[in-house]
């Protein structure tokens, strides 16, 4: 089973348990704290992924590191993934959990790249248009790329909406080359 599929299954199980058990907000906050620790500690991630370190040792490590950070229910989940030899997937499980939570709440992550900085009003207008286009709440991530020459590109999941000047010039070039042939 691929790690993404397995991660999604564990994330889905935790999300379902958290919703049914009434500790969704708590689990979400605790997973966010775990993610911060994992992002800051490469060594911990390597230990969790190491095939040399046994499941009992990983369980003990997770308990030591996160005892003050997480509650009993999330700790049970951490122990479970360690026992099932899936602790190395913890960073991906957290990512998948957030994706599933966003999906359930009608939130979509969108990457907006522009050639020049956009004003707050421009960003708000674009986000409003994207929200009406997708029918979901938009969580935007802004980036700058001078190679676009002008305009913006928007990435929504696997879909890219390219309104950049660079793209328009590439299309024009293709049209001119195909006319010449």
Curated annotation (Swiss-Prot):
Listed transmembrane segments: none
Domain of life from the UniProt record: Bacteria
Subcellular location, record wording: Cell inner membrane
A Pfam family it matches: OSCP
Membrane topology: Peripheral membrane protein
Molecular-function GO term, any one: proton-transporting ATP synthase activity, rotational mechanism
Gene3D superfamilies: N-terminal domain of the delta subunit of the F1F0-ATP synthase
InterPro entries in the record: ATP_synth_OSCP/delta_N_sf, ATPase_OSCP/dsu
Keyword vocabulary terms for this entry: ATP synthesis, Cell inner membrane, Cell membrane, CF(1), Hydrogen ion transport, Ion transport, Membrane, Transport
First-listed, main subcellular location of the protein, grouped into a coarse class: membrane
GO cellular component: plasma membrane; proton-transporting ATP synthase complex
Annotated family: Belongs to the ATPase delta chain family.
PANTHER family referenced in this protein's UniProt entry, alphabetically: ATP SYNTHASE DELTA CHAIN (PTHR11910)
Known function: F(1)F(0) ATP synthase produces ATP from ADP in the presence of a proton or sodium gradient. F-type ATPases consist of two structural domains, F(1) containing the extramembraneous catalytic core and F(0) containing the membrane proton channel, linked together by a central stalk and a peripheral stalk. During catalysis, ATP synthesis in the catalytic domain of F(1) is coupled via a rotary mechanism of the central stalk subunits to proton translocation.
Subunit structure: F-type ATPases have 2 components, F(1) - the catalytic core - and F(0) - the membrane proton channel. F(1) has five subunits: alpha(3), beta(3), gamma(1), delta(1), epsilon(1). F(0) has three main subunits: a(1), b(2) and c(10-14). The alpha and beta chains form an alternating ring which encloses part of the gamma chain. F(1) is attached to F(0) by a central stalk formed by the gamma and epsilon chains, while a peripheral stalk is formed by the delta and b chains.
Protein name per the record: ATP synthase subunit delta
Biological source species: Chlorobium phaeobacteroides (strain DSM 266 / SMG 266 / 2430)
Gene this chain is encoded by: atpH
